[in-house]
Structure formats: C-alpha cells, structure tokens
C-alpha cells in the first residue's frame, strides 16, 4: 500500500493546480516547472556512457557522480558564479598515515563595483574570480545577467537584477535614459533581443512566496464603506419612487 496518494515528485506540480497557485500567470507557473541542470563547476563530466578499461580492454560503464555544493544564505546576496561550499575529507598534517578529518572548501570572495548600462548605476557586489571571468566572457555585466539562466546564477540578487533590467527595457520610453534619447536608442538596440512584455518582466525572479503575495495584492479589493452602500440604495429608491408616482398636470385657468 503506498504511503502517499501521489508520489512526492508530483507534489510541486499538483500544488500549482489548486487555490491561488492556479491563478498565477501561466508564464510564471511554466518557469517554475522548467528545470535545467546547472553547469558543472566543481566537477567535470565524462560525457560518455561506456569506455574501454586501459588495463583489461573491456568495455565498462561510466557513471557521472556530480559534486553538489552547499550554497549558504549569503550566496543569495552576491554573485558566486555557481561556486559554493564543498564538503570533504583530508588527511591531518597532509600525512596519509594521520587521521582523516572533515574539511569545507569555500570560494574566495571579493567586493567589486559593477556598472549596469541598462540601469545606469554602479553596484557593490560580492563576487568570485569565476564570476568576473564570466562577465568578461559575456562582454559586460548586463549581458552576463540577461544571458545566464537562473540555475547558473543561483542568486536572489542576480534574479532581482534581471527583473529590474527587463522591466527597464520593457518601459523603454519612460525609464530608459529619459533625458538622453540617443543613448536610449543605443542601449535599447543593444539589448533588444532580451525584451519581453512588462506583464512577464515583473514576475521574473520572484520566489513562489513573493509571487503568491503579489497575486493576493492584485486580487485584493478594499471594502466599500457602508454609508456609500446605503446612500446608493437610498438614491435608487427615490428614483424608483419618483418614476412610479403619476405626473400631476395642473388645469389651465
């Protein structure tokens, strides 16, 4: 007899079909269901299912076992480029005859100022050397944020940057360099491949809790004061009574 009515792997999918979750925008619910494997940072996949054993010459199966890093809460406040804490073991005093002790390898963090052309502002962000290399490879901070999928960014502040950039591009006429039309057109043409409608841009990067709260605020209606309700009812009653009464026409002398 199964322990659950539905397998746990389907819980996240079924949750989006009920209650306020079902009323979330379709594009946002679709983004939650789209899962992509992050780029391997701390390990190198073989890329093969089978290989020849160099000693026996027999074909043997190759198994890729990924190294899953731990991302502490402070990783959401910076751009670590997919790096995280890796837990393992090493020999004490670098001696194989010594005891094996636990060790945590952590990435080296730096504080750097990064400039965004779309937002026209500098930001002081905690980064790693790999992040800086990825920014250089993408030809700029904006391209790195817009091109990198959420699984590789793996940062709340990174997704906040992406949402702010997409919203700025979507509202080109009002917020994108309002005092410099030539600069506005130049920046817009440079990043126009990433332009999406404002209705989608404002939902990018929101967590499920934030999206639910946003949907509640959109559906929220302030209660109408009772005195307004009673005044409207009184006006309708007077209008109905006036129309029902016969008109009195006075006789001419």
Swiss-Prot record:
Pfam families: Ribosomal_L28. GO terms for molecular function: structural constituent of ribosome. GO terms for cellular component: mitochondrial large ribosomal subunit. It is found in: Mitochondrion. Keywords: Mitochondrion, Ribonucleoprotein, Ribosomal protein, Transit peptide. Residues 1-55 form a transit peptide. InterPro entries: Ribosomal_bL28 (IPR026569), Ribosomal_bL28/bL31-like_sf (IPR034704). The keyword Ribosomal protein applies. SUPFAM superfamilies: L28p-like. Component of the mitochondrial ribosome large subunit (39S) which comprises a 16S rRNA and about 50 distinct proteins. Belongs to the bacterial ribosomal protein bL28 family. This is Large ribosomal subunit protein bL28m. The lineage of its organism: Eukaryota, Metazoa, Chordata, Craniata, Vertebrata. The gene is mrpl28.
């Amino acid at each position: 007899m199964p322990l659950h009515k539905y397998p746990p792997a389907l819980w996240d999918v079924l949750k989006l079909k009920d209650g306020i979750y079902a009323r979330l925008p379709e594009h946002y619910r679709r983004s939650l269901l789209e899962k992509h494997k992050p780029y391997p940072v701390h390990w190198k996949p073989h890329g093969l299912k089978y290989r020849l054993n160099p000693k026996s010459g027999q074909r043997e199966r190759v198994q890729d076992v990924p190294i899953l890093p731990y991302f502490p809460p402070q990783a959401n406040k910076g751009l670590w480029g997919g790096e995280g804490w890796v837990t393992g073991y090493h020999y004490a005093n670098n001696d194989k005859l010594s005891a094996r002790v636990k060790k945590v390898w952590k990435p080296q963090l730096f504080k750097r100022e990064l400039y965004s052309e779309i937002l026209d502002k500098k930001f002081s962000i905690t980064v790693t050397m790999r992040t800086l290399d990825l920014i250089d490879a993408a030809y700029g901070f904006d391209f790195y944020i817009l091109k990198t999928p959420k699984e590789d960014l793996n940062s709340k502040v990174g997704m906040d940057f992406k949402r702010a950039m997409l919203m700025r591009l979507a509202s080109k006429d009002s917020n994108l360099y309002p005092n410099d039309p030539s600069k506005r057109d130049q920046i817009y043409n440079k990043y126009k491949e990433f332009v999406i409608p404002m209705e989608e841009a404002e939902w990018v990067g929101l967590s499920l809790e934030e999206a639910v709260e946003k949907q509640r605020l959109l559906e929220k209606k302030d209660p109408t004061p009772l005195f307004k309700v009673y005044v409207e009812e009184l006006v309708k009653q007077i209008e109905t009574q006036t129309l029902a009464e016969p008109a009195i026409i006075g006789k001419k002398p």
